[in-house]
Swiss-Prot record:
Functions as a regulator of the biosynthesis of TSH in the anterior pituitary gland and as a neurotransmitter/ neuromodulator in the central and peripheral nervous systems. Keywords: Amidation, Cleavage on pair of basic residues, Hormone, Pyrrolidone carboxylic acid, Repeat, Secreted, Signal. This is Pro-thyrotropin-releasing hormone. GO terms for cellular component: extracellular region; secretory granule. Residues 76-102, 184-214, 235-255 are annotated as: Disordered. Belongs to the TRH family.
Length: 255
């Protein structure tokens, strides 16, 4: 860029030509002042054009630097919102602009929530090698797209299937998972009553079956008394069946 170098050269020339003459030849300047008459405003007339030239050079240099900075600095954009200037220029030249007189910005979406705004977008491309829209009738496209359901991406543990009755299935513990509603019926259901008896999953070492204080028993005073009575009767039967003293031990032996 010749602007700044030219400005520096002019400033250097002015300093070299003005300062040494005033310092080295003071007597010659006094003689010239004595010979020539005093003209008021002559120095100002010489200084003003110099300032104007310098000001013009500075403005030109600033303009060149500003244009260079604008071309050097580029704003970094998001990959999903990046504008393609070449396509805009080509569209302006051809006159093929999108809705609103400009290209529509495509927003980057989540892969599981990506929505096809135009269901025939893949068939609108005439240059595609697969199957252009001109080969397919409208009724075929309508029937084909109506058969394809719009499936929403769900969590693997909460994914619902069409063969299940409930639309949303909650992921459950492996020991409490019920796939079929019939499996939820406990084996304790009575045939005539039709009352569901929920079964609680217990620890294998703490599982109690038939205990008087269990789900089917009562832990009241009557239940405890009955339990104590059963235990006492069991001990009496054991004593009667196995006496400690046999009857032939009591009879004396005959000589």
């Amino acid at each position: 860029m010749p602007g700044p170098w030219l400005l520096l050269a002019l400033a250097l020339i002015f300093t070299l030509t003005g300062i040494p003459e005033s310092c080295a030849l003071p007597e010659a300047a006094q003689e010239e002042g004595a010979v020539t008459p005093d003209l008021p405003g002559l120095e100002n007339v010489q200084v003003r054009p110099e300032r104007r030239f310098l000001w013009k050079d500075l403005q030109r240099v600033r303009g060149d630097l500003g244009a260079a900075l604008d071309s050097w600095i580029t704003k970094r954009q998001h990959p999903g919102k990046r504008e393609e200037e070449e396509k805009d220029i080509e569209a302006e030249e051809r006159g093929d602009l999108g809705e609103g007189g400009a290209w529509r910005l495509h927003k980057r979406q989540h892969p599981g929530r990506r929505a096809n705004q135009d269901k025939y977008s893949w068939a609108d491309e005439e240059d595609s090698d697969w199957m252009p829209r001109s080969w397919l009738p409208d009724f075929f496209l309508d029937s084909w797209f109506s058969d394809v359901p719009q499936v929403k991406r769900q969590h693997p543990g909460r994914r619902s299937f069409p063969w299940m009755e409930s639309d949303v299935t909650k992921r459950q513990h492996p020991g409490r998972r019920f796939i079929d509603p019939e499996l939820q019926r406990s084996w304790e259901e009575k045939e005539g009553e039709g009352v569901l008896m929920p079964e609680k999953r217990q620890h294998p070492g703490k599982r109690a079956l038939g205990h008087p204080c269990g789900p089917q028993g009562t832990c009241g005073q009557t239940g405890l008394l009955q339990l104590l009575g059963d235990l006492s009767r069991g001990q009496e039967t054991l004593v009667k069946q196995s006496p400690q003293v046999e009857p032939w031990d009591k009879e004396p032996l005959e000589e």
